[in-house]
Amino acid sequence: MSTLSGGLRTLSYEAFLYFYPLVTMDVTRLQAFNSPIGTTPGSGPPNRFSHMRAFPTADFRAVVRPNFDTLYSSAWLDLTAGPVRLTAPDTEDRYYMLPCLDMWTDVFANPGKRTTGTGAGEWVIVGPGHHGELPAGLDVITAPTPYVWIIGRTQTNGIADYPAEHAVQDGYTITPLGAEPEHAVDSNYDLKTEPLKIVNGMAALDYFDYATDLLSVNPPHPTDFSQLARIAALGIEAGKPFDASRFSADERGQIEAGKADALAAMLASLPTLGTSVNGWTVMTDNIGVYGNSYFKRAVVTLVGLGANQPEDAVYPLLNVVADGDPATGDHDYVIHFDADKLPPADAFWSVTMYDAEGFQVANELDRFAIGDRDSLTYDADGSLNLYLQHTNPGVERESNWLPAPLGPLGVTMRLYAPKAEVLDGRWHPPVVQKA
């Protein structure tokens, strides 16, 4: 290995980034497979949905920046024993989507209102290389990997809408067309540590050993040849065991340093992950499907595993207000939308308030988000003001009030099925002004 020592750090850096989504997805999958049913979305045996039946409460801490627009229906597919049939009910024009992610975090299919409409739907999902008879008359979706994560979302119009929402969720079904895959629970698997902490805490050589095993099960994308050819110098090749003993102590140090470099670079890139405009960061390209942008794919895994394609949802994040300072609950703010500049979405839009850690905070209205499905008050000219502040602005403005906690604020706008002007950059969220 001495002839490669000078490049080991760089190769380790590249390999860590390349495999980061795959390893993180597998840890997430195994936590779900080994968790009791209903513990987390998607938990329990494969090939069945687990539904979130209500919005998160004020003390919910399972995930950061939860949404209050849709309820989740999550499932992990195991296609190793054969295809499955996926069904969705007639949602009667209700917005829904069932994005299917491969183990590299690419959304390879997304049945739902935007793509297939809201009538009842049926699809067969097959694993890579499948050969065999399939039911006639059904659309076939070929998964790039034998394991698939479906992160379904269904529009919810407040608590009173839950019964109708639950009826739609109950209409999502997964039926194996062959034998049930084997499912043995590992009672010793770590279910308490979040997947990112597990992955980031792995020693580099253990990480690459794990990644090599996964590569033998989950085919790389067809355009990955060049990257795989480079990292083969580390001994990472599908179908071959990874031999960590071949490296000297110095080489091990360089490999570990490459992993550390990769993590540091990912964290350093966060402020520039999207386009910064009017104090907001907006990502409208190269997300959900990444091609050969391995660095972007890894960073999105770090900050938003399971991200949608921008055609389905865009999430502007507030960084600073008009004076260039971050928003805090010590000040009152206004988001003003001109009548012709309201958030352009074919489905719906919202603004959600979090604290600095990305969690909702209890308030007198039990309101954590506000949007176009709420009873908002518009000005006579059709424009709209949203009031972001800690104290109640009074009865005349309460309908447009998004309560804010004290301290640093985390504000996220969500546009579902955004229109073309969002995706091509003609529309931007407005500058947030101090009141």
List PLM regions with ranges:
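A compositional/structural signature for long, glycine/proline-rich flexible linkers
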Residues: 1-435
